[in-house]
Amino acid sequence: MPYYCGVDIGASAAKLVIVDADARMVAKAVRRSGVDYAATAEACLAEALAAAGLARDEIAASLSTGYGRDNVPWADGRMTEIACHGRGAWHHFRRAMTVIDIGAQDSKVMHLDDAGRRTRFKMNRKCAAGTGAFIEEIAYRLDLPLGDLNGLAERSTKDVTLGSFCTVFAATEILARIRAGEAAEDIVKGAFRSVVKRIFEMDTVDGALVMTGGVVAYNPFLVTLVEESFGAQVLVPPDPQHVGAFGAALLARERAQQGEEPC
């Protein structure tokens, strides 16, 4: 049986997925991207192959995506993050939808029709507001491990509104709030609300709302806040961090099965 590989080299994390001929995920891997994307992609591939008990020559086709997609020498082709995240999300929820992906360095809002075709998209790449980098800055300013933020936000009992989306200005405001005696959990929840507000200002929502990305995977309370703002349930794939890599693997499979050349 042939297998297909998708690798998503993000600014912070590299994700890799292997699927079989029936589009079932058989293995995955995730690592910090580091500075040598090629080496990181190679390590992810080796890890996933070992987990699936596969040999390298059993991978019939592969596609790379993400910030470092041009730095994966063994990939047969490259696809945009928009295409791969959209394809991965639509595999899980086959309906018209708006996909919000919150990454380390950018946020994306994608609109798909009920056939999975992309109708429009918007990206936030010029500012850290509404991204994982903003949340990392909050953790740094509060001197907290990044992994503690979600639990803190869940324990908040008071609404605190940060007045700025800008990471630099927000950091200054956080220091002022700490001096004023605001609780860390209330500040973190306020920061999460700031991310949510920024995302909804990027574009409108059409159809079902789906959220993907590592920020969502590690901070599920963000989804709760989005649901409060959206007024309806938010759909989250089983493994939101790997949706881009999964979509790349699915596209590699489809192109190979249709006899198309890698792009």
PLM regions and their residue ranges:
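N-terminal glycine/serine-rich phosphate-binding loop of ATP-dependent small-molecule kinases
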Residues: 1-81, 225-228, 233-234, 260-263
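A short acidic Gly-Thr/Ser loop motif
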Residues: 8-12, 67, 102-106, 214-218
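Active-site nucleophile and cofactor-binding loops and adjacent substrate-binding regions
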Residues: 32-33, 77-86, 100-104, 122-130, ...
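Glycine-rich phosphate-binding loops at beta-strand->alpha-helix junctions
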Residues: 67, 200-201, 206-229, 240-244
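Conserved phosphate-binding catalytic cores of ATP/NTP-utilizing and phosphoryl-transfer enzymes
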Residues: 67-120, 200, 247-257
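Glycine-rich phosphate-binding loop plus the immediately following alpha-helix
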Residues: 115-158, 163, 250
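Glycine-rich phosphate-binding/hydrolytic loop that grips phosphoryl groups
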Residues: 135, 237-263
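Adenine-nucleotide phosphate-binding core of ATP-dependent small-molecule kinases
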Residues: 167-204, 241
